[in-house]
UniProtKB/Swiss-Prot annotation:
The gene is msbA. Belongs to the ABC transporter superfamily. Lipid exporter (TC 3.A.1.106) family. Residues 29-313 form the ABC transmembrane type-1 domain. This is ATP-dependent lipid A-core flippase. ATP binds at residues 379-386. Keywords: ATP-binding, Cell inner membrane, Cell membrane, Lipid transport, Membrane, Nucleotide-binding, Translocase, Transmembrane, Transmembrane helix, Transport. Involved in lipopolysaccharide (LPS) biosynthesis. Translocates lipid A-core from the inner to the outer leaflet of the inner membrane. Transmembrane domains (TMD) form a pore in the inner membrane and the ATP-binding domain (NBD) is responsible for energy generation. The chain crosses the membrane at residues 16-36, 66-86, 156-176, 252-272, 278-298. It is found in: Cell inner membrane. It catalyses: ATP + H2O + lipid A-core oligosaccharideSide 1 = ADP + phosphate + lipid A-core oligosaccharideSide 2.
Length: 585
């Protein structure tokens, strides 16, 4: 292992240690139990010497006390090993479970604090793999790997002590062999760490590919994309297989190499034992104990070689998790907090570029939206309409200019307080795998009564279909409302915004998924909702925004026209052209 890799492993483990040491009581019990379990092998071997030496001249020479007590020693030793094995396994599994749970919670909570721009750049499948696969690798490093390291380490120390106690001359060969074995383990550890990192990335690709197919299953079927997805998944899964085989190959090579090195020690012991100088001093019991202990070292050495790969996988995964946790969370430097804003919005010379793009999405955009008024944004797709809505809620920060709410720049508000002032109904509705009632009252706790939820659903014209559901408002709707139609999902999103009763309302294609009849019904409810509120409407259907106090036409990130519906029609510009296209005038 290179010095940098060693330092990386050490630094990672130092950072992981507080998670483990928090449960030091369980860890201490487990370590003590592991040491007791490991020393059982040493105790078993130590009994060989008195048995052989005392019976060297025949069974009649065996001391009756020792022989009579042997069955009790063996039974007691087996019980002790069994009990210590159970205690160590249970305690370490408990500790590792707690550690992984806290890591997962920490990562999950950190993801919720990350800016939207982070998720624009990252694959959701890869991030899911970090929470699931990578954290499980950490569990291996803190449970089974730690079990092997402590138990086999104690076994090696115990067996070596037994060997030197009985014959330091025969055991001295270990002083030569041990550094060679240690060097070999360091070499394979470097290889294990590199492969483990590649396996994490490969698993992220597998998860991402599978997630894309599952979420886009209807599109795959509609366009006959089965072969495309099959080839994509075949490629990433084969890459995962290749990385796994590289790890297996490294393990398969490392084990016999370590055992061959250790076997030289056995050969040297046999040669030395055959020399006249030592032969006169050795008893059968001494030789059997030393040779048996040296042979017994094979198993823990092999186990330590195997566990090195497991430990390095855990450390590589842990390093990745900590790197994600170290990413800067969404900035929230605002101090201003208010119970309810009036809703007066001013946008002054705002320019904004998405982090993943090179060209600005908005260029020097300016407009005023007085409190209680309605402003509509229209234009072709990709012109920058929804971007303005994202900036009002500070999902992104502007490059230049000013974005003002009630006389204060939005960056001066506490993020949570700012977003409490705004209710958003987007064309991309997200619902949770929960009841209809809990989706409408999402994240509100006990702030709203059942009657409040029903009223919001009524205003959104959602009760018509809710009453037909098996359990009404208590019906589970599946992941992202999979059991509902597009229009039904949109109505629940509108009900959620109605219940929130925020002073600023953003309707981003809010009725795009509704049929004409439902749109008319909801439009009436939305018009009622808009009273005494500041409303920003983003729409393709011009019929929904004809009554707006002001309409802005956005094209390529710039406002090219502004005015009321009548003024823009009279102007006979871009808006009038859009109107003619939609209504066939």
């Amino acid at each position: 292992m290179t010095q940098s890799t060693e330092q990386s492993t050490l630094d990672t483990y130092k950072r992981l240690w507080p998670y483990i040491s928090f449960y030091k009581a369980g860890l201490s019990v487990a370590v003590v139990a592991l040491i007791i379990n490991a020393l059982g092998d040493t105790l078993m071997l130590s009994m060989i010497k008195p048995l052989l030496d005392e019976s060297f001249g025949g069974l009649d020479n065996i001391e009756s006390d020792f022989l009579s007590m042997m069955p009790y020693y063996l039974v007691g030793l087996m019980i002790l090993r069994g009990a210590s094995g159970f205690v160590s396994t249970y305690c370490l599994s408990w500790v590792s479970g707690k550690v992984v749970m806290n890591l997962r919670r920490g990562l999950f909570n950190h993801f919720m604090k990350m800016p939207v721009s982070f998720f624009d750049k990252e694959s959701s499948g890869a991030l899911l793999s970090r929470i699931t696969y990578d954290s499980e690798q950490v569990a291996s490093a803190t449970s089974s790997a730690l079990v092997s390291m402590v138990r086999e380490g104690a076994s090696i120390i115990g067996l070596m002590a037994l060997m030197f106690w009985n014959s330091w001359q025969l055991s001295a060969i270990l002083l030569v062999i041990a550094p060679v074995v240690a060097f070999s383990i360091r070499l394979v550890s470097k290889r294990f760490r590199k492969i483990s990192k590649n396996m994490q990335d490969a698993m992220g690709s597998v998860t991402s590919s599978a997630e894309q197919m599952l979420k886009g299953h209807k599109v795959v079927l509609s366009y006959g994309g089965q072969e495309v997805e099959k080839q994509r998944f075949d490629s990433v899964s084969n890459n995962m297989r290749q990385q796994t085989m590289k790890l297996v190959s490294a393990q398969a090579i490392a084990n016999p190499v370590i055992q061959v090195i250790a076997s030289f020690a056995l050969v040297v012991v046999l040669v030395l034992a055959n020399s006249e100088a030592l032969r006169a001093e050795l008893t059968p019991g001494t030789f059997a104990v030393v040779f048996g202990a040296m042979f017994g070292l094979m198993r823990p050495l092999k186990a330590l070689t195997n566990v090195t790969s497991q430990f390095q996988r855990g450390m590589a995964a842990c390093q990745t998790l900590f790197e994600l946790m170290d990413l800067e969370a969404e900035e929230d430097n605002g101090k201003h907090k208010i119970a309810r804003v009036n809703g007066d919005i001013q946008v002054k010379n705002v320019t904004f570029t998405y982090p993943t793009k090179d060209t600005p999405a908005l260029r020097n955009v300016s407009f005023d939206l007085p409190a209680g008024k309605t402003l509509a944004l229209v234009g072709r797709s990709g012109s920058g309409k929804s971007t303005i809505a994202n900036l009002l809620t500070r999902f992104y920060d502007i490059d230049s200019g000013e974005l003002i709410l009630d006389g204060r720049e939005v960056k001066d508000y506490q993020l949570s307080n700012l977003r409490d002032q705004v209710a958003v109904v987007s064309q991309n509705v997200h619902l949770f795998n929960d009841t209809i009632a809990n989706n409408i009252a999402y994240a509100s706790g006990d702030s709203f009564s059942r009657a409040d939820i029903e009223k919001a659903a009524e205003l959104a014209y959602a009760m018509d279909f809710i009453k037909g559901m098996p359990k009404g408002l208590d019906t589970m709707i599946g992941e992202n409302g999979v059991s509902l139609s597009g229009g039904q999902r949109q109505r629940l999103a509108i009900a959620r915004a109605l219940l929130r009763n925020a002073p600023v309302l953003i309707l981003d294609e809010a009725t795009s998924a509704l049929d004409t009849e439902s749109e008319r019904a909801i439009q009436s409810a939305l018009e009622e909702l808009q009273k005494d509120r500041t409303v920003l409407v983003i729409a393709h259907r011009l019929s929904t925004i004809e009554g707006a106090d002001q309409i802005l036409v956005v094209d390529d990130g710039e406002i090219i026209e502004r005015g009321t519906h009548g003024e823009l029609i009279k102007h006979d510009g871009a808006y009038a052209q859009l109107h003619r296209i939609q209504f066939g005038d």
